[in-house]
């Protein structure tokens, strides 16, 4: 099986899953090539699993024609069985290459279907997303395939390196600093829980506002901004709890990161976490935007070691039974086989 990936993403959970899947498919014997944007911090993590090409697709630019020419040359030389586009921009660039099975993986809810003209099958990461795509009028095939995380044991970072006391309760938040991720609410919630520190692993356009909020609340001594980390598990290993506070979260890799690191998770009732997680079984769930409820959940975890242990075990079991690397990789390989057989 030969697969050509097109991915014009930047930095974040979607990119982590892209790297995870490429490497998982490589280990299953799939030959792969990938077209990505230049300068990606995660390029080195792809190099063992795929031959990499770099380029930028812009709608109004002469460079798009050069990139299209390069892609056509790669397709002639590589002759892929499958072309897989990742998200909107890559789907717009999907070639009408009749010799390959053409799929697009949706990481979020599309506003319309105009970008998927050359796509035969849409892969949705939740049943709700698949239903919304049908409502928009998609008549071709849909598959629902979730994500997995490649949790790799990592030694904990030294708390002293982040000026954090050894006996503090440490909450870890992770992702791109955009409004919908709810980091401002997480900062406000942590303010209400004494002897609790917050490590924010990531970066993004909201960073300046988040740092300003931290200063306004007098929390500079308890909040740490670590920047992007290619392997965040060292920070998760050193923390005590993981929090997802998104107002909108289809099913990012972030939904599995705490479980993968063996940490108890608190999550907002956004779309993805609501499908994946069960309140009191493998996570504590709070309403979106409920800073008071989030603070209460953090305090509850801080004060109840038995609850932390129970939620960690429940999360590990959910990850193993529903969202394992093997199960998700098997689903993609089965989709590839069925699609290629129809050509």
UniProtKB/Swiss-Prot annotation:
It holds the Pfam family Glycos_transf_1. The keyword Glycosyltransferase applies. Coiled coil: none annotated. Keywords: Glycosyltransferase, Lipopolysaccharide biosynthesis, Transferase. GO terms for biological process: lipopolysaccharide core region biosynthetic process. Its EC number is 2.4.-.-. It comes from the Bacteria. InterPro entries: Glyco_trans_1, Glyco_trans_4-like_N. The keyword Glycosyltransferase applies. Pathway: Bacterial outer membrane biogenesis; LPS core biosynthesis. GO terms for molecular function: glycosyltransferase activity. PANTHER family: GLYCOSYLTRANSFERASE (PTHR12526). Belongs to the glycosyltransferase group 1 family. Glycosyltransferase 4 subfamily. This is Lipopolysaccharide core biosynthesis glycosyltransferase LpsD.
């Amino acid at each position: 099986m030969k697969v050509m990936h097109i991915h014009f993403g930047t930095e974040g959970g979607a990119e982590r899953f892209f790297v995870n899947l490429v490497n998982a498919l490589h280990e299953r014997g799939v030959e792969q090539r990938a077209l990505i944007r230049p300068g990606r911090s995660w390029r080195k993590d792809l190099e063992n699993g795929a031959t990499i090409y770099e380029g930028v697709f812009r709608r109004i630019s002469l460079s798009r024609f050069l990139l299209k020419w390069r892609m056509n040359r790669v397709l002639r030389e590589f002759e892929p069985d499958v072309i897989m586009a990742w998200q909107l921009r890559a789907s717009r660039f999907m070639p009408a290459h009749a010799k390959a099975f053409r799929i697009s993986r949706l990481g979020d809810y599309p506003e319309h279907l105009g970008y998927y003209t050359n796509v035969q099958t849409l892969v949705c990461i939740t049943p709700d997303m698949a239903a919304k795509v049908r409502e928009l009028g998609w008549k071709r095939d849909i598959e629902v395939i979730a994500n997995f995380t490649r949790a790799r044991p990592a030694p904990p970072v030294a708390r002293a390196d982040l000026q954090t006391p050894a006996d503090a309760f440490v909450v870890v938040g992770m992702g791109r600093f955009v409004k919908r991720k709810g980091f401002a609410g997480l900062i406000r919630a942590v303010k209400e829980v004494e002897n609790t520190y917050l490590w924010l692993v990531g970066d993004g356009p909201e960073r300046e506002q988040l740092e300003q909020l931290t200063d306004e609340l007098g929390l500079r001594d308890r909040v740490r901004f670590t920047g992007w980390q290619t392997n965040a598990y060292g920070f998760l290993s050193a923390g005590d709890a993981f929090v997802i506070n998104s107002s909108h979260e289809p099913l990012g890799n972030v939904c599995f990161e705490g479980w993968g690191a063996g940490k108890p998770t608190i999550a907002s009732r956004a779309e993805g976490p609501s499908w994946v997680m069960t309140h009191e079984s493998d996570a504590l769930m709070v309403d979106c935007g409920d800073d008071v409820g989030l603070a209460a959940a953090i305090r509850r975890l801080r004060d109840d070691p038995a609850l932390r242990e129970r939620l960690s075990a429940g999360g590990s079991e959910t990850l193993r039974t529903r969202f394992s690397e093997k199960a998700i990789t098997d689903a993609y390989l089965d989709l590839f086989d069925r699609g290629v057989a129809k050509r």
